[in-house]
Regions:
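Active-site hotspot residues in diverse enzymes, especially metal/ion-binding acidic/histidine motifs
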Residues: 1-204
Length: 204
């Protein structure tokens, strides 16, 4: 059978053997996901904003519950799941070397600002590695190219601009929805793969 997209929930639960739970992780929505490699407790919030306590067992991924109820946030939910799953993959592959510092041995938080920061300076290598692996798993070249063919985008997009190239932009937007990712995340990945030359998503 043909595969057209990666489903992070299936990947985490069926392939990696992880448990996924959806809860409110912060008052202001600033924390999108968290996981740990060992047993420890974390603060979460009930629907009425009362503080609660959740016990992480080292094999659980917590995701902000708001991401699970808004279809417009599907791309962000999928990336959050795969980001936290990537931390667990690295720990499985390198159990004696990954997540052993005092900082990384605790809870790994994925924050809402993580995918929008403009800085090119990498300040946390484990977070950068998790982002990079998550993008590679969610958006492999073969699936992007298959999707580009299905949506009539050719072999490469020269310019992504909503105002000047609306037809291309609409097909691209449909592709990102089809692949279950945000338009920005797909643009970053396509640039890495040489499938997109310029994008004006921030300033059309």
């Amino acid at each position: 059978s043909q595969v057209y997209r990666i489903e992070p929930e299936l990947m985490l639960e069926k392939v990696l053997g992880l448990t996924i739970e959806y809860m409110h992780l912060s008052y202001d929505g600033s924390i999108l996901g968290m996981t740990s490699f060992g047993e420890l407790g974390v603060q979460v919030f009930e629907n009425n904003d009362d503080e609660a306590f959740f016990f992480l067992d080292g094999k659980t991924v917590l995701v902000e519950s708001d991401l699970n109820y808004d279809n417009n946030l599907k791309g962000r939910k999928n990336f959050t799941l795969m980001h936290e799953g990537s931390h667990q993959i690295f720990k499985m592959l390198f159990p004696n070397d990954y997540g052993i510092t005092e900082k990384s041995a605790g809870v790994h938080y994925y924050k809402a600002t993580a995918d929008t920061e403009k800085s090119r300076i990498i300040t946390d290598w484990e977070e950068w590695q998790a982002n990079t692996l998550a993008a590679a798993i969610l958006l492999p070249r073969c699936l992007i190219e298959k999707g580009m063919f299905l949506f009539g985008l050719g072999d490469k997009i020269e310019c992504l601009n909503k105002i000047y190239y609306p037809a291309v932009y609409e097909r691209y937007a449909a592709l990102s929805d089809f692949l279950g990712c945000s338009k920005k995340a797909l643009a970053i990945r396509m640039k890495q793969l040489g499938l997109l030359h310029k994008d004006y998503l921030d300033n059309p």
